[in-house]
């Protein structure tokens, strides 16, 4: 299969075999994957995001299931975003934290937090055995233009505060893409997942990037409801990006 990319050659796409769906336990899934050996992949990636694709490691994919179209690509038009009351409270609750953007280079501290997060969120699912190799393959890859947004407790005696969260973020000319976020489960009251997205939005606004891509939203899926709580949300229907009304947050 090929698609036209306004380059000298068309892009090759591969269709995976069916595999267990990561969202619905009673369904099978399959994906379309851009040719992982295409040397243009890094240059093509910004356009692929606009086509509804997403990155995992070095793979750029989008769901292509035979009997299901539940996964909807979504992004935030950051210039039009306004936090709701719950999101403003989240920002206020975490105003003591230190946020910085660093190179996408694994540290022992990040790896320890990642493994702790997976053991808490995905026990027995295979990912909880991830080590340094899997961290690099899944979150960094070989060609992506990624950065890590670190969220820490305040510094003590000139020493960095405890690492609470890392938001793996791809940077393109006109957008940011939220690849994966992991955080300490013990700080649930801080709503660090929401706080990380709010920080990514502010990052995109500061750098005058048009969008923050949030991956896929699934209507009616409890783990995806949080994405509808952000204003200025747009969904891709396969041809066009269209606005979605925000759902109210619940404190």
UniProtKB/Swiss-Prot annotation:
One of its GO terms (molecular function) is arginyl-tRNA--protein transferase activity. Its EC number is 2.3.2.29. InterPro entries: Acyl_CoA_acyltransferase, Asp_Glu_LeuTrfase, N-end_Aminoacyl_Trfase, N-end_Aminoacyl_Trfase_C, N-end_Aminoacyl_Trfase_N. It is found in: Cytoplasm. Keywords: Acyltransferase, Cytoplasm, Transferase. It is an enzyme of class 2 (transferase). It comes from the Bacteria. One of its GO terms (cellular component) is cytoplasm. It catalyses: N-terminal L-glutamyl-[protein] + L-leucyl-tRNA(Leu) = N-terminal L-leucyl-L-glutamyl-[protein] + tRNA(Leu) + H(+); N-terminal L-aspartyl-[protein] + L-leucyl-tRNA(Leu) = N-terminal L-leucyl-L-aspartyl-[protein] + tRNA(Leu) + H(+). GO terms for biological process: ubiquitin-dependent protein catabolic process via the N-end rule pathway. Functions in the N-end rule pathway of protein degradation where it conjugates Leu from its aminoacyl-tRNA to the N-termini of proteins containing an N-terminal aspartate or glutamate. Belongs to the R-transferase family. Bpt subfamily. This is Aspartate/glutamate leucyltransferase. It comes from Xanthomonas euvesicatoria pv. vesicatoria (strain 85-10) (Xanthomonas campestris pv. vesicatoria).
């Amino acid at each position: 299969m090929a698609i036209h990319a306004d380059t000298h050659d068309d892009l090759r796409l591969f269709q995976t075999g069916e595999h267990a769906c990561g969202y619905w336990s009673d369904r099978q899934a399959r994906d379309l994957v851009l040719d992982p050996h295409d040397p243009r992949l890094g240059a093509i990636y910004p356009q692929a995001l606009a086509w509804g694709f997403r990155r995992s490691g070095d793979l750029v994919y989008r769901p292509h299931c035979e009997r299901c179209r539940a996964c909807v690509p979504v992004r935030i038009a950051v210039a039009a975003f306004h936090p709701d009351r719950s999101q403003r409270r989240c920002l206020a609750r975490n105003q003591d934290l230190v946020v910085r953007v660093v190179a996408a280079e694994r540290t022992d501290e990040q790896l320890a937090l990642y493994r702790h997060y997976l053991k808490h969120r995905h026990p027995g699912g295979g990912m909880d055995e991830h080590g340094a190799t899997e961290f690099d393959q899944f979150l960094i890859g070989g060609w992506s233009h990624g950065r890590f947004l670190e969220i820490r407790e305040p510094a003590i005696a000139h020493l960095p505060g405890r690492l609470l969260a890392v938001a793996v973020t791809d940077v393109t000319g006109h957008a940011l893409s939220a690849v994966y976020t992991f955080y300490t489960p013990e700080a649930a009251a801080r709503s660090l997942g929401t706080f990380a997205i709010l920080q990514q939005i502010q990052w995109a606004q500061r750098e005058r990037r048009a969008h923050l891509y949030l991956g896929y939203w699934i209507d009616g899926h409890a783990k995806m409801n949080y994405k509808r709580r952000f204003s200025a949300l747009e969904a891709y229907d396969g041809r066009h990006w269209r606005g979605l009304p925000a759902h109210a947050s619940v404190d």
